[in-house]
């Protein structure tokens, strides 16, 4: 019975960081959809990048950042498309 309790505790310790990782990825997807809907996030110009690392002993490191890649090019191509 004692070994069974240890097994359950191990599953909880491992499961919590994985659950947090899943929630963060879900939030990232929701943010991308919302930003696309209001016209801020353009797939060719801004990328939302999430770096999630699970470190031993259940420490979770999360880095959420935006990468802007040549926004002037995408803005000018959108501007040119509106006149064609």
Curated annotation (Swiss-Prot):
Membrane topology field: Multi-pass membrane protein
Residues spanning the membrane: 7-27, 52-72
Main location: membrane
CC per GO annotation: membrane
Keywords, alphabetical: Membrane, Transmembrane, Transmembrane helix
Compartments where located: Membrane
Protein name: Putative uncharacterized protein YCR018C-A
Lineage: Eukaryota, Fungi, Dikarya, Ascomycota, Saccharomycotina
